[in-house]
Amino acid sequence: MPGIRRWSVLSLGLALPTAFFVLGPLGFLLWMGATQEGADFLERARDLELPRVVGQVALLATLTTAWAAALGVPLAWLTVRTDLPGRRLIHWLAPLPLAIPPYIGALVYQILLAPGGVLPNFLGVTSLPLNLYGVGGAAWVLGLFMSPYLYLLVSGALERTNPALEEVARGAGLGPRQVLRRVTLPLLRPALLAGGLVVFLYSWADFGVVSLLRVRTLTTIIYDYIQGTADWALPSALSILLTAITILVLLLQLRVLGRAGYTQIVGAVKPAPLVSLGAWRWPAFAYVGGMVTLTLLLPLGVLGYQASRLPAPAAFVLIQWPYFLNSLWTAVSGASLALLIALGVAWSEGRGRAWRVSGLLQVGYAIPGTVLGLGMAGFLHAALPGIYATSLALIVTYFVLYVTPACQSVKAALAQLHPSLEEAARSLGRGPLAAFWAVTLPLIKPGLLGGWILVFVLSMRELAATLIVRPPGFDTIPVRIWIYAMDVGPEPRAATLALILVLTIALPWAMMLSLRSRGIPPSG
C-alpha cells in the first residue's frame, strides 16, 4: 500500500500542473469563443467564405495524404522487401528529409520554380506553365516532405510482419500481386491508417506552407485576424472549429481500427526473403534516387546556391546569431522539460497504480500549433502575466505540444525492462530513486536520448505557435525565415537561415537514424 500511495502522489503531482497548462488554453478558447454571438459569427463566416475555405482545406489534406502515400509506401516496400541496391543506405537516407520542415520545402521550390526563380531563369522564360501557388502547389510540397512519415511507419510494419503468412499464401498458389493485395496490404492497414492520419492532420492544420504559397485556410485566417484586431472572439471560435474537426478525424480513425482485429499469432519472426526485382532492379533504384533527390539533395543544393548569393554572409550570420541562440535555448529547455515530465509519467504509470496522466498529455499533441499558440497566449496573459511575453511562455508551449512523443519513447524503453530488476536492487537496501538511478536509468538511456532529440527537433522547427506566443522582439530562426520570405520573397537571407536550421536539426536526427538503420541488413 505505501508503494501504491507513493506512485499516486507522484502521478497526482504531475497531473495537476500538466492539466493546468494543457487544459487552460483550451478553456480560454472555449470561454472567448462563447462570447462570439451566434448571429454575428454566421455573418462573419459568410464574409470569410468559411464553407469554401473548409472545403479547400479538406481538398488540400486529401491530396497531400494521397501524394505522400504514393511516394512513401512503394519506397518502404522496395527498401525492406526487395534486393534493391544500397538498401541499407537508403533506409537511413529516406527518413532524413524529416529534418527539412515543409515550410522550408515550400521556400526551396519557390526559389526553384516561382516566376524569376532558378529554373525559369535557366530556361530563359519569365515563368513556368505550372503554378506553384495554390492548393496544388501546397499539396505537392506537403506530400513530398511528409512522405517520410509514411515511409517510417510502413517500413517498420513490414519489418515486424511475419513472412510466414505470405509464404503460406504463395504456397496456396497466389501470385506476387495477389499476395500483396490479399495478405501484405491488409497487415499494413494499421500503419497506413496511422501514417495517413498524421499526414492528413498535419496538412489540415498547416500554417507555414499555406501562408508562403498563398492558400487561404483556417490557420491563415486565424493568424491574420489576431494580427489586425484585439478582438479574439472570432479567431477563438474558428480555433474551436478547427480542433473539433481534428478530434472528429481522430475518432473516425479509432472507429475504423476498432472494427477489425490485427493480431498475428506467431513466434519469433525471421527476416522475410527478399523479392528479386530482376530487370527492374536499377529502374527501381533510379526511382528511389529521384525521391532522395527531390526531398533531400535538391533542397540542400538549392538552399546552398541561394545562400551563396548573399553579400557579406559572415556579417549577416553574426547579426542573426541572437535568433539562433533564442531557438536553441527554447528548444533545449522545452525538450528537457518534456523529457523530465515524460520520465515521471512513464515511470509512475509503469511501476504502480497511478493517475493516467499520459492520456491528458495527448490532448496537447492533438491540438494544431496555431490553436494552441492562440490559447496559450491568451491563457498566460490572463492567468500568469509574469510568464506571458517571456521566453518561458515558448518553453511551456513546446512542452505541451510535444511531450507526448517523449512519453511514448520513454514508455517503450521502460516496457523492455522487467520491474524485477528494480526490485532486486531494492532488496539490497536501495530506495526507489536509488534503484532507478543505479539500475533502470542506464538501461533506458537510448530511449531517453531518442525522446529528447525528437522533441528538440520538433521544437526547433516550430513556426505557427512560436509566431503567436513569442515575446516582442524575441524571434527564432523559423520566425525570421518566415518574415523574410513573406516580406521580400525567397531571397538569400531566408535561404541562409533555412540552411542553418536544416543543418542544426539534421545532426541529431541523423544520430537517431544511424541507430535505427542497423536493423536492415545490406542487400545481397
Regions found by a protein language model. Name each.
Residues 256-288:
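Flexible interhelical linker loops that connect adjacent transmembrane helices
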Residues 2-7, 173, 270-276:
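Cytosolic juxtamembrane amphipathic/interface segments immediately preceding
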Residues 4-36, 48-159, 187-207, 235-254, ...:
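Membrane-water interface segments at the C-terminal ends of transmembrane alpha-helices
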Residues 111, 204-230, 463-491, 524:
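Glycine-rich helix-loop "coupling/hinge" segments at transmembrane-helix boundaries
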Residues 165, 262-274, 421, 515-524:
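Short cytosolic juxtamembrane segments of multi-pass membrane proteins
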Residues 46, 82, 158-188, 215, ...:
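Short helix-to-coil transition segments within interhelical loops
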Residues 118-128, 214-216, 313, 473:
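Membrane-interfacial helical/loop segments at transmembrane boundaries in membrane proteins
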Residues 43-44, 157-158, 182, 198, ...:
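Short alpha-helical segment immediately N-terminal to, or the first helix within
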